[in-house]
């Protein structure tokens, strides 16, 4: 039937179509939760026209929002729910699914990183999906760094001694330090010794870049997130933060390229004896793993710096805040250090036998993981889990860590107990699972499964060696109350402005 026969004109149809289109658009914009099964836990409030305030509430209170949602009595969100995050809408999954999805290839971490960290935009390519440096980095860390740890402990200890003398000083009077600022260069120097060898670990320009690049990177990430995706490549060309990021990468290339070219030339000239003379550092491991493939050495080095230095510094900083007002625990740790290192020296067996220290570090991670949402992924297909939970293709997911402070799992779960995992290791079947580097659905600050942090064994070694030096060489105490943890979305940081007081003491054994 012709519309005109009913007295309906084309202009009326156009106006009606526009009205319907505007209404649909308004519903999508004003009520975004209807696009997600079960709605959004932290949707916009009445009269809020955008998600800006919802994102701000998430940034300042994500831990409480997530925990409350899972604990709701109506059971509506007992398994999973959608939230507006500072990274768009994501599905928050209960930790009971961690073991099931840990090795599921339908959940892609590289796709998540590319989408979340602008991996296709110049300056952010280190997080581009399937970029060659990503696989080289993972393989080099898993196969070479972890395997070489025993030979690296002595050199790491040497760098800790040097860095503490410079940044913590030998002052025997009580004085205040900004703890995070004092820890960061110590971790950066020892890490650079392993990543770049003796040639660059004392290079002031490289040290500046390796410390600053993580901050520059995440500031640039946040700067682009305020733009619609389609405009981000253009915005990145003019953003001062993105320009600074690209400049740091170019400076890193200028520093590392001559070192790499010189090594390649030397190895070609002495190829018959190359295997016995090659340095034992990440530059060399990347070369061996690449096996002739072209890659960006500076980008690979900066990626491991972004992944390792600040997170390791954060763990050590928070650990020192946690124990600074516990002299009895500090004394027990010193006794363990003297007994263990005094007997074994810097060997892997010594680090393994620092069981109380291991417990203190794992307990610190339990109460304050670097992120309260881990195992971040994007689903590559529609997924139905074993109990029927459905996750649509293209969904950004993360697993909540709220069971790490669950009173049903841990006694006095809201309290710091440095001896907790030390005692648990004594129980049958708990010796391995209670170690810092072990992961499980009840403690997965390092992630869990196939993509658990590949550098966690190295990070554990660094923190333990540094803590041995600090506790034997310095007395420490809090300045006032313990500094609050800084929360920003799912991220949790040791307070960068928090201070402690220290003074040099005479160590009982040589380190």
From Swiss-Prot:
This is Cytochrome P450 monooxygenase esdpI. The lineage of its organism: Eukaryota, Fungi, Dikarya, Ascomycota, Pezizomycotina. One of its GO terms (biological process) is mycotoxin biosynthetic process. Keywords: Heme, Iron, Membrane, Metal-binding, Monooxygenase, Oxidoreductase, Transmembrane, Transmembrane helix. Pathway: Secondary metabolite biosynthesis; terpenoid biosynthesis. Heme binds at residue 453. Its EC number is 1.-.-.-. It is a single-pass membrane protein. Cytochrome P450 monooxygenase; part of the cluster that mediates the biosynthesis of shearones, diterpenoid pyrones (DPs) which are structurally diverse meroterpenoids consisting of a diterpene linked by a pyrone, and which may exhibit a range of bioactivities. InterPro entries: Cyt_P450 (IPR001128), Cyt_P450_CS (IPR017972), Cyt_P450_E_grp-IV (IPR002403), Cyt_P450_sf (IPR036396). Belongs to the cytochrome P450 family. GO terms for cellular component: membrane. Its cofactor is heme. GO terms for molecular function: heme binding; iron ion binding; monooxygenase activity; oxidoreductase activity, acting on paired donors, with incorporation or reduction of molecular oxygen. It is found in: Membrane. The chain crosses the membrane at residues 14-34. Shearone derivatives produced by this cluster are interesting candidates for Alzheimer's disease (AD) therapy since they moderately inhibit aggregation of amyloid beta 42 (Abeta42). It comes from the Eukaryota.
């Amino acid at each position: 039937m012709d519309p005109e026969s009913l007295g309906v004109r084309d202009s009326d149809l156009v106006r009606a179509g526009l009205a319907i289109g505007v209404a649909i658009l308004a519903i999508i914009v004003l009520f975004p939760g209807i696009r997600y099964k079960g709605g959004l836990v932290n949707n916009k409030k009445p009269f809020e026209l955008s998600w800006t305030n919802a994102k701000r509430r998430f940034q300042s209170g994500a831990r409480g929002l997530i925990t409350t949602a899972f604990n709701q009595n109506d059971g509506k969100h007992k398994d999973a729910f959608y939230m507006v995050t500072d990274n768009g809408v994501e599905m928050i999954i209960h930790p009971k699914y961690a073991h099931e999805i840990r090795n599921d290839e339908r959940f892609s971490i590289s796709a998540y990183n590319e989408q979340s960290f602008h991996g296709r935009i110049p300056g952010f390519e280190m997080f581009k999906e399937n970029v060659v440096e990503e696989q080289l980095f993972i393989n080099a860390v898993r196969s070479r760094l972890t395997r070489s740890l025993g030979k690296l402990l002595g050199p790491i200890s040497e760098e800790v001694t040097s860095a503490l003398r410079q940044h913590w000083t030998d002052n025997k009077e009580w004085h205040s330090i900004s703890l995070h600022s004092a820890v960061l260069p110590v971790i950066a120097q020892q890490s650079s010794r392993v990543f770049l060898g003796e040639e660059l670990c004392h290079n002031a320009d490289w040290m500046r870049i390796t410390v600053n690049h993580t901050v520059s990177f995440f500031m640039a990430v946040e700067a682009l997130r305020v733009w619609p995706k389609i405009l981000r490549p253009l915005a990145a060309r003019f953003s001062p933060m993105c320009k600074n990021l690209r400049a740091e990468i170019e400076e890193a290339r200028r520093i590392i390229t001559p070192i790499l070219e010189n090594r390649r030339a030397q190895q070609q000239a002495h190829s018959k004896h190359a295997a016995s003379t090659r340095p034992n550092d990440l530059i060399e491991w990347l070369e061996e793993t690449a096996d002739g493939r072209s890659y960006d050495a500076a980008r690979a080095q900066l990626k491991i710096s972004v992944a390792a230095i600040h997170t390791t510094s954060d763990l050590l900083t928070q650990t020192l805040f946690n124990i600074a007002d516990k002299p009895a625990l500090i004394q027990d740790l010193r006794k363990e250090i003297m007994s263990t290192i005094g007997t074994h020296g810097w060997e892997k067996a010594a680090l393994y036998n620092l069981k109380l220290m291991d417990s203190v570090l794992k307990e610190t991670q339990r109460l304050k993981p670097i992120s309260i949402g881990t195992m971040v992924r994007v689903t590559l297909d529609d997924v139905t889990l074993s109990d029927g939970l459905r996750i649509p293709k293209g969904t950004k997911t993360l697993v909540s860590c709220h069971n790490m402070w669950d009173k049903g799992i841990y006694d006095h779960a809201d309290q710091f107990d440095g001896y907790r995992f030390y005692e648990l290791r004594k129980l049958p079947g708990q010796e391995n699972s209670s170690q810092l580097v072990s992961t499980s659905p009840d403690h997965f600050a390092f992630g869990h499964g196939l993509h658990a942090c590949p550098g966690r064994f190295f990070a554990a070694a660094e923190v333990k060696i540094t803590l041995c030096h600090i506790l034997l060489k310095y007395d420490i105490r809090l300045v006032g109350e313990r500094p609050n943890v800084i929360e920003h979305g799912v991220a949790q940081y040791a307070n960068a402005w928090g201070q402690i007081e220290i003074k040099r003491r005479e160590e009982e054994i040589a380190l």
